[in-house]
Every structure is written in C-alpha cells, then in structure tokens.
Curated annotation (Swiss-Prot):
ATP 1 binds at G171, P172, P173, G174, C175, G176, K177, T178. It comes from Arabidopsis thaliana (Mouse-ear cress). It is found in: Membrane. It is a multi-pass membrane protein. Residues 1-22 are annotated as: Disordered. Belongs to the ABC transporter superfamily. ABCG family. PDR (TC 3.A.1.205) subfamily. The chain crosses the membrane at residues 507-527, 541-561, 594-614, 626-646, 651-671, 737-757, 1134-1154, 1173-1193, 1218-1238, 1253-1273, 1279-1299, 1307-1327, 1362-1382. Keywords: ATP-binding, Membrane, Nucleotide-binding, Repeat, Transmembrane, Transmembrane helix, Transport. This is ABC transporter G family member 43. InterPro entries: AAA+_ATPase (IPR003593), ABC2_TM (IPR013525), ABC_transporter-like_ATP-bd (IPR003439), ABCG_dom (IPR043926), ABCG_PDR_2 (IPR034003), P-loop_NTPase (IPR027417), PDR_assoc (IPR013581). GO terms for molecular function: ABC-type transporter activity; ATP binding; ATP hydrolysis activity.
C-alpha cells in the first residue's frame, strides 16, 4: 500500500524549522524547556484558529485548558482526510518516540485449550415461561427436582493474538465468537464454567486487571439517552485516564531535552493534550469523533426508543468510540459494523489498522459481512464453527488451505462469504473444485484435523508449547490498578454527570414539583382551618391531614425507583469496565437529591401549614419542614435501594408497592400501635413513617394550643396521642428526626452495597448453534418452488417527483433532509437504495411510506398513477423496519400467524393462511426456531439475526404488492443475508415492487438488484438507473466523471461506489455529484420514463379497497384477544408478582386485623375495620396500576407498527387489552375473599360476600385501566409514574378515610364523587355494617352503627344500588378513554 499524499496539511516539520517561523518556535520552545516537569508536560506551542480556519501566531499555552472551539478546529486541521491524515499523525508520533529510543508497550494474547460451558435447565415440553411453568420452577428449587444439563460453547480452542497485527474473527451466528471475545477480554459471566488458560505477555488474569488492560466493544449499544455523543465520549475518556501516555510523555520530554530536539509543535500539543488525566473534556474525544465520522452529531443527544436522538449506525460507532477513546491498546470488538455502510466500515477499520501497526496495538474484530476491501485490511484470520477454531493464521493463506481441502472460492465471490458458506452443510457442495472426484461433505472436525496437520497448524502448536518470555518491559502494557483516577476525581466526575442528568431531566422534577403544589393546594383547602377547633373529633381530622402529608411525600419518591432501574444497565456496564466503584455512583445520586427533597418538603409545608391551622409558632413550622424533609429523603433512598437490588421493572415496582404497604400499615395511623399484635410491634419501629408520625404529632400536639386540660387530668394533646399510641414525650421529636436520618444512611448504604456486590441483571443468555450435521434429513429451501401458495395481488407502480422533506430544529430553523428526490419503483424490479450513513435513505422510505409523524413534506407521490391514499397504501404495502419491533411473548410461528390472520383478505381460508406461514418459515429458514419465544432484544429470546429475519417474514406473510425494506441484511452474517436476499429476489420476480435500503452488500447481493438509487448527504440523488450486467451501467456512469479512480479487478462495485461518492472523495474531485446527475442525460431519460410510467398506470383502474382493514371487526378482536391472552399468560414477571403482592397484602391485613370485624363496640373498632379495607383497596390498586404501566408500555411500540400497517382498528386492540385483564383481576378478588374475609371476621352471607368480591373486583379494574390510560396519554414511563403518584394522592385524599365526606368542603365535594376509591370503600363498609342496628360508643356518645356510618362517613345503606352502578361505570369509562386515546395519540417521533 502506497503512502498517502499529505498536500495541504500544515504540519510543522522538525527538519524544516528554519523556514517561516522556525526561529520563533525555537525561542518559545526554550521557554517551555525551562519549566518544571509537571508544567512542561501540559504546556505546548499552540496555534489558535478562528472558525474560518485562519491561524494566529503560535504561543505558549496550557493544553489542559483548551476551549471547545480550539480543540475542534485543531483536530479539523490536523485530520482533514481521515484515512490519509490519521496515518500521517500516527506515523509522526511513532517517529518521535523512535527518535528518542522509546519502545512502545505491546501485548500478546495467548489462549490454550479454552473450554467454556453453560448450565441450562432441562424442561419437558416447550420451554415457554407461562404462569404454571414459573410456579413449577419456583417450587422445584425447594423440591430439588430441577434437571440441569451443560452446553459447551467453546470446545478446546487455542491461539495467539499478536501485536502490530489486526485479526478478523469469522463464523456463523452461534459459533461462539462473542464468548471467545468475552473470555479473552476477561469479561465472561462468572456463572459459566471455564477451563484452559488465557495470558497477556505470559501473565495470567490474576496478575493484572484485564478489564483495564483490554477493551471489549459489545454488539449491544447501551448508553444514557440524555447525554450527547460528545458527553458520552468525554465521560468514558475521563474515567479510562491516560494510561501510560503520561509517563511516556514525561520520558519523551526528558530525552528530547537531553538531545536538544525541538518537536513538531502540533504533534507535541496533541500528545500532551491526550496525556492529561481526569479532565472534564479531552482532545482525544475530538480525535475519536473525527475518525469515526461522528463530528456531525457530536452535540446531539443519544436518545432511545421514546426520545429522538442519533441513528442506529451512529449509535454503533459511539459504542466503538466509547471504548477506544481511552489509552487501551488491546481491543476485542464484536460486530462493530452493524448498521454501517461499507465505506464507513472501511474507513474505521483502516484507522484501526494504522493504530495496530504504528502504535503496537493488538486487535481482534468479529464482523458479519466484511466487504473484500475491508477483509484485506486484516493481517490474520480466525474462522470458527460449532465452538471450535477451524483456521487460525495469516489471512493470505486461508484460500490455499481450503483449496487443499478441495474447495475453491470463485472469482467475484467475497472470500468472507465463501468462508462462512464452505463450512455449512447446505452451501458447501457448490465450492467443490475436484470435478473428477465425487463430492462428499467435509465436516468441521475434518477441517480442524487438516489444519492441525498443516504447516500453519504445526507452527501454531509449536509456539503455544513454548513458555512466553516474561520481562518487565513486556509487563509495562499491563494495568495493575483497577481505577485510573483518584477517589476524589472519580467522585467529582460522577457528580458532574449526575448534575447534568438532573438538568436534562429538569422537566420531570419541575413537573413533579408542580403536581406537588397542585395537590398541596387541594389538601390545604380540603382541611381548611381544621386545626382552629380544639377537640377530639377535629384532632382526628388533623391527624388525617398529617398522615396524608406523609403518604404524599412517601409516594412522591416512587419515580426514583423507575429512574434507578432505567439507568442500572449502563451503570453495570461501566462498573464492569472499572470506570468507577459503586460508591462513586451512589454518593452523588444521594447527595444531589437533597436540595430537591428539601424544596418539595418546604413547598408542601409552606402551602398547608398555616392554612390547615397547625400550631402557629415559627419554630414548629421549621420542625415540620425538617421531619418531612427527612422522610422524603429516606423514602427516595429506599426506592433507590429497591431499584438497585431487584433491577427488573415489574419486580422492583411490586417490591416498592409492598414497601409502601408495610410502611403505611405499620406507620401508626391505619393501625394504632396498641392495636397491633404484640409479636408484630417490631414492624412499628422499623417503619420510617412511624418516626415521621411521631415527630409530626409530638411537634403539633405538645404545642401550647393543645394544653387544655381534660377530665382525665391530661392535656388534650396528650389524650389524642395516647388514643393513637403515639405519646412518647416532648423530646421524641429529635429522636424521630435522628431515626429518619439513620434510615436515609442505611438505605443509601444498601444502595451502594447492592451496586457493589450484586450480579449484573438481565445479562444476555448464551446462544449456541444447533448441530445441523446430526439431522437425519436436510430441509433445503428451494426458493423457486415456493409459488404453490402464491396469492393474487395487484402489481403497482410507485412514482415520486420533487419530494422534499423539512424538519424544524430546536433553534426554530428549517432543516432540509430530502432535496428534490425523483424516481419510480416498478413491479418486478428489485431496487436498491444506497448511500453513506446519514444520506437520508431511511428518511426517504419513511416519507414515501407515510410513516413520518412530524415535519413538512412537499412533492408528488403516486401509486398506480393516482395520488397515494394512505389508508389504501398501508393495506397493500409492507414495511420492514430497521429496528426489529415484535411482541416478546409470542413464538416466531405465532408472530407470523398473527400477521397473516389480520393482513390477508378474509376470503382466504385458515388452511391457506397456515400453509403460507409454513412456507415463509421455510423460505426464511426460521422453521427450526418456530416454537422459540421472540423475547426481548439483548436479554432473552431469539438472536439478533433471527429477529431480523422474523421482521422480514412478518411482512412477507401479508402478501403485499409493494415492499419497503430498511436494512434487511443488517446484523446478518453473509450466509443469512444471502438467504434473505434470495427470498427477496424471488418476491420481486413474482411481479411485486420491492425496495431495499442496504449498507454493506456483497457482490452477489448487490448484483441481485435491478436498479439503484444512490444518495448523498443532504438527501440528494446522485444516481438513479439500472445496474447492468456485473454492475456495468453504474460503473460506466461514474467512470465518465473525470478523476474517478478505476474499479479494481474482482473488487466489490458497491464498496467502490460508496467510496468514490463519499464527502471526502467529492472534495478531492472538486465536484458536486448531485449537480452532475441533474445535468446528465440519464436524469432527463429518467424524467421521461417516470412520466411514461405514470401515464401507463393511469390507464389502469384505481385501486379501491372495500374496507379499511382486511378482516371484519369481530376477526380483528379475536386475533387481538388471542395475542393478548398468550402475552399475558407468558408474562409471569407481571402476573405472578401482582398475585403474590395480593396474597401478601391480604395476609398482612388478615394478621393485623385478626377477627377485628366480629365485635364493634366503639368508633375505633370501626376505624380499624375501615383501615383494613382502605389498605387492601389502595395498595393493591397502586401495585396493579404500577405494574400494568410497564406491561402496556412494552407493547406500545409494537402497536404503533401494527396500527400503521392497518392490521386492526385501535378499538379492537384496546377492547382485547381491556378484557384480558379481567380473569387476572377476578383471580385477585377471589384471593381477597378467601384470605381477608375469614381472617378479619366479616359477616358470612352470600349478599355481603358478593358485595366484598364485587367492590374489590371493580377497584382492581379501575386501577388497572387507569394505569393503561396513563401509558397512552404520556410519552414515557417516567412521566406516567409521576402522574400516577399524584393520582394516588388524590384518590387517597378523597377516599373518605383521612377526611370523611361530611367534612369535605362543599367546593371539593365533586372530587369526592369523582374519586373511585370513595365508592369502593362505601360499598365495602356499607354492605357490611350499613344494616347493623347495634349501639356503639362513638366520641363519647351512644349511636347505632348504621347512624354513625351516615353521620360520620356519609354512607347510607339504601344507596348501595347507586354505588353498584357507579362502581361498574368507572372501569367502563376508563377503558373507553384508553381506547379513544390509543387511537388518537402517537408519541413515536419519526
């Protein structure tokens, strides 16, 4: 490879300092040399530049204090053309170190006889996690009946990854590539059984810290969505530190001073800036942004599924950049090219190759579909299959090895594709080269034996048998420190990030505070001047107001739980990388929430204190603020600890709800301490709410205004406290405050310990390939024979002219993403849509298909010669999205069956639909996994490439006339991509219109297309026309442009096209390819052809469908209910946890209120019974509402996809979602009756039992449906949870428990009637005691129970019929609102 040209790059050369400003540089350098070492290594001669690129005079500067603009402009000038100038930069750095005689540290990785095994559970039948299976699995832990087996992932692999060389890791999915990368980087899951030896420079993992010596780039993109790309890289670079750069810079500086060498000022400035540790921002970040092509989105937030952000390809590059921004030189990289075009992949790997060769790096990269040019960048190659290494040696010799085995790679065939297919039983025969000998399948074990006997194999075994020569020099590259920064620097960096995340989530905190002010305003007017009357009755109301304040602030901490769980995955990744210890993450999380806790406590007290009428002394006001502040702080600490311990949304939410129940029930208000069983009194002392209750009540009732003496020779305040069991003396306030601070410290300690010691949750399961070689029969996919079930369809032409698309930027400006795009997609023609990353390919597909939910679209789009009608178009088209969105709890076959059921016309029989489903399963080679659960990406279920094939299959079964496919081969290996594209080609040959965006096509895949639309950045077309035989037409077009380099023989034309049309190539040529196309004859011909196509299409009948949906409303509902039933039944984490929670709550109430309902002698007995009802209703409802939010939110993105495809009316979906909840709520209600009814001692009669069952059943439905409604009216679960907390506060306040109906001010009585809990509690209490005529002692006077209910609570027995109607009306209303809003609102931003 020739050295690149460096014209135009303004490097100051040491050998040329005499020219220009040489004397000035020397004199300035002398000043730097006189500085102390600590200052000299951060001081350089830096040339400032302005935004126009104009340079000022060089001056001595501290490079640790460079501004953002200085760093960006410096890197822009240093690296103008990435591939060329990066080599020059690294070469100059290497020359500088060589001149002073410094050897760069290097690492050789050896592994010998490495075995990795995983334990798996053996189940009978389908291993699908249903409710029964989950219960059986839990029970098997106690019965020891669980059967386990072992799966071998790696089977005795050995090899050497050498420095200065870049090694490619190839193999089919499931062969063990990821496990090998994890094993070599020291990141294997401890639960896996490992045998064998891995060493770095002869040192075992126990002698150093492998996580800090090597980097593993995961294939899962896991980032904090609120951070920008630059902030993500800066944070990673800060914690990875400078490694050996700092010491090396000191040594270079010392030796240069001794030799009198004046270094290149730019290189010196770069090296010194890159060696700075612990800085908030770093020049290395700008360098990584440049070489990865992320400069354009550097200040864009990463985003996620619910928040706009960077593209999938950019996210993939960010994952790579996050690992290589540090000083680590041993890199293990897992499928880093997913979602990237071949040109970008080539550019990134070229830079990595230069790094390996010039900086002594050791790099092992696994790729799925490397283009020939990318393939040739590698020095060595490891080919794997079935957990074994087939070949390990120089890349140049692998073809000759397989030729010796009898297999030859054809011309114009990518070697990487050949290697992955030649080891496959299905594809091997086509490469047999000994035509004079009969072909016989050569197994992987046979290949391995032949390699071991070859010269390369013998040489490898010989090297591995020799003991590595350890020396101190070779150990310099090994890191023995876990963390790169000091404790203080780690704390500061984590605090900076936490504060930034709080700023980015400021809307949530402001919104939460706004809701708190709203609820506080309601509460203060409900309890208006309650404290102005001093008697036992009003004291009871005042206690209710204090309890409500505590419950509100307790529930206000719940959003902290969801926030903790949502960030735990990123924390675990960074902890495993030894970015920082758990305490550095935990302490800022706790400390920075203190001001928020204080603010919310102060706001609440300021609103309510004097309006309600508490003791007016200023000191008591401050003490109430302090108690509420301490409670709020302890509660958010508790929820944070729960999130860290359990880490699963459903489980953590359920545990959070259980915690609220325990804290509330043992808090001293719902159940008085004297009324608790003696053996459960410890619960009172373990509840933070108890101490808050003690603190607030002692602060209030020991005030002067409550010192009125009663007949019992006690103050009124003491009498009130004694009645509640809260009289612990005046000094108890500070004891309570201290206890709450102690709880805060305890929960934060638990939080830190959980983060430190608990295993990473939700780690992806190990996927191993099935041994297809042992199958008795081979199922060969004969694509040509798949026409037996072909269905009639209408061939359609799709034309678009002068399409433009604009979006509005945050600054209020319009940004154009598509510019005058014109083209046509014709029946039977397979069209490729190509371009560099960010060119607008996906944007164009989204605009043409009508999927954009924002922005301004201009231009003409026609289907069949008529203006596109979206309802009709959605029915006749299919869209395979880039991101594979599916229901996680269906199997692969059920996903296809569901799609066929709803999208194929209703006149097609069920047998035909099933045949089509089976045919597509066979065509896309999904038959072997048809009974596998789809699962959640990266956590469970099918692999990424199987998920991609499922996405395509789901669209194929719908028999569309037009199919849009966005990156259908992304994430697939070469063989799987070929399978998919054969199926796609076959579809196009049936006369359908097929369009695919594609990033890294092989020669075979690329030339399977008939036409090509090529785009450049800015959404402009630079070529639209036929490919021609062997891509001759498109090659001829670009070769006609002066200066375009020729295509090398047997090279991939797709890679060549992307390379010559990149931005850097355009700049070199000095042309605008879009303008050249618009001025070309081809463009004029295309315009004529498009017009002719339109005119021809106009002669056909307009496509009119009889209905908006393929199926009747009844069929839609049946299909949706079938799917929802399966999804719920197979979701034990949702249903089992809420059932367990119901059992727990009922048992707790049964124990605490044991037989309390049998004897009612005074108002307190009635209050106890009412408390048990309140506890079950409110807290079981809270848990149901919380858990259903995650369940519905998981399916919402799937719903958006299915709704766009016009699979069903939203009413059919919502009705099924509503009805599927009923059996589970029914079961929970039965649990209540079975446990609570006999334990509490309610009256046994059919009427009363039914009323209890009916009231609880309606209550559960109300909370379930309200949770579902919250999901569809909010953009994400964090907002939903914040609104949910306010809903709890309102239904608690107006339930009639803390403030009975007769005492609610008339201006708020309408809220009482709107609160569902008030009707539920009315039904429960009135049905039990509304007809009781027994006299009791109530507040010093005798009253009948029925009269007391009417006077105190406002409950009348003769109103039960109205209560029954209202109770069923609430769930119907909420379900209707859910159905309405799910059809109207769409928070998916496209």
């Amino acid at each position: 490879m020739t050295m690149p040209q460096t014209d135009g790059v303004e490097f100051a050369s040491r050998n040329n300092l005499e020219n220009g400003d040489g004397d000035q540089v020397r004199s300035q350098w002398v000043a730097i040399e006189r500085s102390p070492t600590c200052k000299r290594i951060t001081t350089a001669l830096f040339c400032k530049r302005d935004e126009q690129g104009k340079r000022s005079q060089r001056r001595v500067m501290d490079v640790s204090k460079l501004e953002d603009l200085d760093r960006r402009l410096f890197i822009d000038e240093l690296i103008r053309h990435v591939e060329d100038d990066n080599r020059v930069l690294l070469q100059k750095i290497r020359t500088r170190t060589d001149e002073v005689g410094i050897d760069l540290p290097k690492i050789e990785v050896r592994f010998s006889d490495l075995f990795v095994e995983a334990e798996c559970e053996v189940v009978h039948g389908k291993p699908i996690p249903t409710l029964w299976n989950a219960i059986a699995s839990k029970l098997s832990r106690f019965t020891f009946s669980k059967q386990e087996d072992k799966i071998s992932i790696l089977k005795g692999v050995s090899g050497i990854i050498r420095p200065k060389r870049m090694t490619l890791l190839l193999g089919p999915p499931g062969c063990g590539k990821t496990t090998l990368l994890l094993a070599l980087s020291g990141r294997l899951d401890p639960s896996l059984k490992t045998r064998g030896e891995v060493s770095y420079n002869g040192h075992l993992f126990s002698e150093f810290v492998p996580e800090k010596t090597s980097s593993y780039v995961s294939q899962n993109d896991l980032h904090i969505p609120e951070l920008s790309v630059r902030e993500t890289l800066d944070f990673s670079g800060c914690f990875q530190g400078a490694g050996s750069r700092l010491e090396m810079m000191k040594e270079i500086s010392r030796r240069e001073k001794l030799k009198g060498i004046v270094p290149d000022p730019d290189i010196d400035a770069y090296m010194k800036a890159a060696s700075i540790e612990g800085s908030k921002t770093n020049l290395q970040t700008d360098y990584i942004l440049k070489i990865l092509g992320l400069t354009i989105c550097a200040d864009t937030r990463v985003g996620d599924a619910s928040r706009p952000g960077i593209s999938g390809g950019q996210k993939r590059r960010l994952t790579t950049g996050e690992m290589i921004v540090g000083p680590i030189k041993t890199l293990f990289m897992d499928e880093i090219s997913n979602g990237l075009d071949s040109s970008t992949t080539f550019q990134i790997l070229s830079c990595l190759q230069q790094f390996a060769r010039l900086s002594e790096g050791t790099i092992l990269v696994s790729l799925l579909q490397p283009a020939p040019e990318t393939f040739e960048l590698f020095d060595d190659l490891i080919l794997m299959g079935e957990g074994k290494i087939i070949y390990h040696g120089p890349r140049d010799f692998i073809c000759s090895f397989f030729e010796d085995c009898g297999f030859k790679c054809p011309q114009r065939k990518s070697v990487a594709e050949f290697l992955q297919e030649v080891i496959s039983r299905k594809d091997q025969e086509q490469y047999w080269c000994h035509r004079d000998k009969p072909y016989c399948y050569v197994s992987i074990d046979s290949f391995i034996e032949k390699f071991k006997k070859s010269d390369l194999g013998l040489q490898l075994q010989d090297e591995l048998s020799k003991t590595y020569d350890k020396s101190q020099t070779q150990k310099d590259g090994l890191c023995i420190r876990k963390y790169s920064l000091s404790n203080w620097d780690m704390f500061k960096a984590c605090s900076r990030r936490e504060f930034l995340l709080m700023k980015r989530n400021s809307f949530v905190y402001v919104f939460k505070s706004g809701l708190l002010i709203f609820i506080g305003s309601i509460a203060m007017t409900v309890y208006l001047r309650t404290g102005s009357t001093r008697d036992s009755l009003h004291a009871n109301y005042l206690l209710g107001s204090l309890f409500f304040s505590l419950i509100k602030l307790l529930a206000d901490g719940l959003p902290e739980l969801t926030l903790t769980v949502s960030r735990i995955a990123v924390f675990c990744k960074q902890k495993e990388l030894y970015f920082y210890p758990a305490w550095a993450y935990a302490i800022p999380s706790a400390i920075l929430k203190i001001p928020i806790s204080f603010l919310e406590s102060f706001l609440w007290t300021m609103l309510t204190y004097y309006v309600i009428g508490y003791s007016p002394e200023a000191g008591r006001f401050i003490r109430q603020v302090l108690i509420l502040f301490a409670l709020h702080l302890s509660c958010i600490s508790m929820f944070r600890a729960i999130g860290a311990v359990f880490r699963d949304f459903d489980v953590a939410t359920t545990i959070g709800s259980i915690s609220i129940v325990l804290l509330s029930v043992f808090g001293g208000f719902i159940v008085r301490k004297p009324s608790m069983p003696s053996w459960l009194e410890w619960g009172f002392w373990l509840s933070p709410l108890s101490y808050a209750e003690i603190g607030l009540t002692s602060n209030e009732f020991f005030a002067p205004m409550w010192r009125k003496m009663t007949s019992e020779n006690r103050t009124l305040g003491e009498q009130v406290l004694d009645a509640r069991g809260l009289n612990f003396g005046n000094q108890s306030y500070w004891n309570a405050f201290g206890a709450l601070i102690g709880f805060t410290l305890f929960f934060n300690t638990v939080f830190a310990l959980a983060l430190t010691f608990l295993k990473t949750s939700q780690r992806s399961r190990v996927i191993v390939s099935h041994d297809k070689n042992t199958q008795s029969s081979e199922k060969d996919s004969k694509i040509a024979s798949h026409s037996k079930n072909a269905l009639p369809f209408e061939p359609l032409t799709f034309t678009f002219q002068d399409v433009q698309y604009f979006i509005e930027t945050p600054q209020g400006k319009k940004l154009q993403l598509l510019s005058d795009v014109t083209g046509a997609f014709k029946p039977g023609v397979l069209t490729a849509l190509m371009g560099v990353s960010g060119a607008g390919k996906t944007t164009l597909l989204d605009v043409l298909s009508g999927r954009k939910t924002r922005g301004d679209i201009k231009g003409q789009i026609e289907v069949g010669g008529y203006v596109k009608v979206q309802d009709t178009f959605s029915r006749v088209s299919g869209y395979c999205e880039q991101f594979d969105i599916h229901s996680p709890n269906l199997t692969v076959q059920e996903s296809l069956k569901y799609s066929a059921w709803l999208r194929l016309p209703c006149n097609i029989s069920s047998e035909t639909k099933s045949a089509i489903v089976n045919e597509v399963l066979e065509t896309i080679e999904l038959e072997e996994i048809k009974d596998s659960l789809v699962g959640v990406p990266g956590i469970s279920g099918v692999t990424a490439e199987q998920r991609k094939r499922l996405t395509i299959a789901v669209e194929l079964v719908s028999n569309p006339s037009i199919i849009f496919m966005d990156e259908p081969t992304t994430g697939l290996d070469a063989r799987a991509a070929a399978i998919v594209m054969r199926a796609v080609k076959n579809i196009a040959e049936t006369g359908r219109t097929v369009v695919c965006t594609i990033h890294q096509p092989s020669i075979d895949i690329f030339e399977a297309f008939d036409e090509l639309i090529l785009m450049k950045n800015g959404g402009k077309i630079i070529y639209y026309g036929p490919l021609g035989q062997h891509s001759s037409k498109v090659i001829e077009y670009f070769m006609s442009i002066p200066g375009v380099p020729k295509l090398k023989e047997n090279s991939n034309p797709a890679t060549w096209i992307l390379d010559i049309t990149s931005k850097s190539s355009e700049d070199k040529l000095g042309v605008d390819l879009a303008h050249i196309y618009e001025e070309s004859t081809l463009f004029k011909e295309n315009k004529m052809v498009i017009e002719q196509t339109r005119c021809t299409s106009l002669g056909s009948e307009r496509l009119i469908l009889s209905s908006r949906y393929a199926q009747t409303s009844w069929e839609q509902f049946k299909a949706c209910l079938w799917k929802q039933h399966l999804s719920y039944w197979r979701n034990p984490s949702y249903n089992l946890t809420r059932i367990i929670f119901m059992c727990f709550t009922c048992m707790l109430c049964g124990i605490l209120f044991l037989q309390k309902a049998k004897e009612i002698n005074n108002q307190q007995d009635l209050f106890n019974v009412f408390g048990s009802m309140f506890t079950v209703v409110l807290f079981s409802g809270i848990n149901n509402c919380s858990t259903v939010i995650f369940c519905v939110a998981t399916e919402r993105n799937v719903f958006y996809r299915e709704r766009f495809s016009r699979m069903y009316n939203p009413w059919a979906y919502s009705l099924a979602q509503v009805l599927v909840e009923i059996p589970y709520s029914l079961f929970q209600s039965i649990i209540y009756v079975i446990i609570v009814y006999p334990m509490v001692g309610y009256h046994w009669s059919v009427y009363k039992v039914f009323w209890s069952f009916y009231s609880i059943f309606c209550s559960l439905l109300i909370f379930n449906y309200f949770g579902m409604l919250l999901v569809v009216v909010t953009p994400n679960v964090h907002i939903a949870f914040t609104l949910r907390s306010s809903f709890y506060a309102i239904v608690n306040l107006f339930a009639g428990y803390v403030m009975p109906k007769p005492n609610i001010p008339r201006w708020w009585i309408w809220m009482y009637y709107l609160s569902p809990t008030s009707w539920v509690l009315n039904g429960l209490l009135t049905s039990q005691y509304g007809d009781m005529e027994k006299e009791i002692l109530a507040f010093g006077e005798k009253k009948k129970v029925s009269a007391f209910l009417e006077d105190y609570f406002g409950y009348r027995y003769d109103s039960l019929a109205l209560v029954a109607v209202v109770l069923i009306a609430f769930p119907i209303l909420l379900a209707s609102l859910f159905a309405f809003f799910i059809g109207k609102l769409n928070f998916q931003k496209k």
